[in-house]
Amino acid sequence: MPKIRLMVIDDSLFFRTFLTRNVGKDISIEIVGSYGDPVEASRNIQALRPDVIALDMEMPRMRGDEFLRTVMPKHPTVKAIVISALSGNVFDAMHAGAIDFVGKPGSTPGFDESKFITEIIQKIKVASTAHTHRYTDQRPVAARPAAAAPAARPVVSGASSKNVIAIGASTGGTEAIIEVVKHFPANTPGVVIVQHMPPVFTKMYAERVDRICAMSVREAKNGDRVQQGTILIAPGGDEQMYLRQDASGYYTYLTPGAKVSGHCPSVDVLFDSVSKVAARNSVGVILTGMGADGAKGLTEMKRMGAHTIGQDEESCVVYGMPMEAYKKGGVTEQLPLSEIANAVLRRFSGRR
């Protein structure tokens, strides 16, 4: 089997050396180029024919997202992953065509060198077989009135949502989620989301989605009420997120927990909890992602009466999680990404 041809672009000589030395030990990966200057790197793509490019976000002369917007149209078969310090700009690179990203050492708590290299190698391998997609422009919605300062949790400051939309995604999901929720009007039932992502980045991602959507979007906290017009995104880290219910309605319950289906937070944990308390009042959506997280939970949601939707293979960056859910019989309908928002909204037509 041919080796994955990898190009590394980072203005730090120390980090380039660290990365090429360690990633190059994997027998399935061949380092074909290492550059500190993205402009120089772009001139050599045609000759070196990399399968995957691992690049920094903040570099002299050209940012990572600018590099991708320049290179991807000319070399559409090349895949990219971003290795970035803590910055919301990483999501600009995702929109420009990057398959995935990894937080640089020091950008996320508890750096483990061995775990970091293992994660990068895994993401390089996934990226090499992923599908690339071009997404539509993400224009912010008209400005909303500033939200009131949150009260002690749980809060009941808005209309409690009688229905719940639960969404799970992994590789390629940051853009896929936006492609769905940007079509939701401000009065859409409450949405809860698990997107596999490093700690801290989820807050920046929620802020980005909030600028684009008509709904209010934020990183979830323990006890947040699931309210009409609000999207809650599970924080990355060591807490699992569950949906709970009391006399006032649905709320999020976050608690430290072991990985489930290989992840924390886990889509399976969220979906399974939704099946127990929302059942027929919920819609479950599983989007692009590697592995099987969410397949069991979505199947349980369907068994309990929820309507379930899986993204189809053609529109997925990685057709893993939706495929496993489909194989288990957990998908009511399988749809292209562009049709999922309307399918969700049809289920709640006339009821919130």
What are the functions of these language-model segments?
Residues 2-4, 13-24, 28, 34, ...:
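Conserved acid/base catalytic micro-environments in cytosolic active-site loops
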Residues 10:
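Conserved acidic carboxylate
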